[in-house]
Amino acid sequence: CCTDENALCSLKAHNVNRISFGLQSGNDNELKALGRRHNSKVGADAVKTAYKAGFDNISGDIMLGIPLQTSDSLIETINYMTSLPLSHISAYMLKIEKGTAFDCDEMRNAVADDDMLCDMYLQTVGQLASKGFLQYEISNFAKEGGKSRHNLKYWHGEEYIGIGPSAH
């Protein structure tokens, strides 16, 4: 996670108006299981630093089906995320792709089964709604005014500009 306030201020000064953080979880054991380089404190500090740098349109990602994740730890993650100055949350299910570090029996056996994933998804939708994050796409939730304009333009077939090494 980038916690350099000067870099964030520079982005803001160059008219970047939205920033997204791949937080994934508020549980350090789950983050470690994912091989993430940050812990929950570093993630929270990065979001708070972005807010302090002037960003008020900040998105965070939650991952469902992480090894070790339970219904209770998911609620803790949702509470962690909604305690931060986020206006948007994306919730994605872990998908193990062939040829990746997760493509092994140990990891496949550690992730939630389909029924549990469905329960976690429904739990996420309900918990986020109770915290003011309304669902507007299958995996996206926003507070009032926090919807991703890029996503909406994409789904409505409008033009947009992609910038960066993976832009298309």
Q: What is each of the regions a protein language model found here?
A:
Residues 1-168:
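C-terminal scaffold of the Radical SAM
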